[in-house]
Swiss-Prot record:
It comes from the Bacteria. Keywords: Acyltransferase, Cytoplasm, Iron, Metal-binding, Transferase, tRNA processing. PANTHER family: TRNA N6-ADENOSINE THREONYLCARBAMOYLTRANSFERASE (PTHR11735), TRNA N6-ADENOSINE THREONYLCARBAMOYLTRANSFERASE, MITOCHONDRIAL (PTHR11735:SF6). It comes from Sulfurihydrogenibium sp. (strain YO3AOP1). The gene is tsaD. GO terms for cellular component: cytoplasm. Binds 1 Fe(2+) ion per subunit. Its EC number is 2.3.1.234. Its main location: cytoplasm. Its cofactor is Fe(2+). One of its GO terms (molecular function) is N(6)-L-threonylcarbamoyladenine synthase activity. Required for the formation of a threonylcarbamoyl group on adenosine at position 37 (t(6)A37) in tRNAs that read codons beginning with adenine. Is involved in the transfer of the threonylcarbamoyl moiety of threonylcarbamoyl-AMP (TC-AMP) to the N6 group of A37, together with TsaE and TsaB. TsaD likely plays a direct catalytic role in this reaction. This is tRNA N6-adenosine threonylcarbamoyltransferase.
Amino acid sequence: MVVLGIETSCDDTSIAVYDSEKGIPSNVVTSQLIHAQFGGVYPEIAAREHTKNFLPVLDKALRDASITLSDIDAIATTFMPGLIVSLVAGVSGAKTLSFSLKKPLIPVHHIEAHIFANFITKEIEYPFLALVVSGGHTELILVKEFEDYIYLGGTLDDAVGEVYDKVARALGLGFPGGPLIDKLAKEGKEAIKFPRPLLNDEENKYNFSFSGLKSAVIREINKGIYKKEDITKSFQNAVVDVLVKKTVLACKEFGINRVVVAGGVSANSQLREEFLNIKDLEVHFPPMHLCTDNGAMVAYTGYKRFKEKGISVSLDFEAKARCRIDKFPQLLRSFHA
């Protein structure tokens, strides 16, 4: 089965092909560098760029896979969550292809796709704890099976990747901030003991909060006392400490020794090192090229949904800016084609 995967939930236009016999023969990602000058993503600009990039990216994805549209068996696309104007750009393109080619339209949840990007290169046993860390999300999810999810907690304010971007902007490092801070932190030491938000809060043991940490870091930046590399190291130590300890706590309480880390921040070298150093914990990370938003994870997850659940949806199914992953399977059934 050959599935076309479309991802436009934020500022990356990505289209990929998943072939059940060949794997991922193509995965084209066009990043919108125009946002770097603003230090963040502007939705209206993102939507315009998606519309401009869609056909060239589609053409390259097909050429890289050495196929034509007639070889496609189904169209998978990210329907939710994300920037609504960005999502609509991809969903509109997917619906047009589905209608004109008379092929099934398979909906994919953005968080779900990040999690199952880990499955593209290896099989992972259920159940497992998923830690999703990206520019828009910080969530802990118990995955019992595909489409059987228990949402444990998420961020109460800023997502971890968003805070990385804002701290990087305050330091004058550029955008996106995650890789830049990760690189600079390797040269620094922990000169400041920043707060570990909600780390010992029983009522919020699976929730996250990074706005206070962000403010504390920016205050220290504005004082101009410490070196940039020491600030980034101190900041990253606090972030990684919170992410790892809350995940390990959930593993202990649910009796699970398997963790899947997903999302753009899963590329962080210190986060990987801290998790992989934990004894008796099986931790999985996606390949580096599948950490950030990409069409391959959408194509594969769409294939998995169609193969295991037989799910496709009618053209009436609409994109949504918000939808928790545990609510998504039930929502699908009301629009099952």
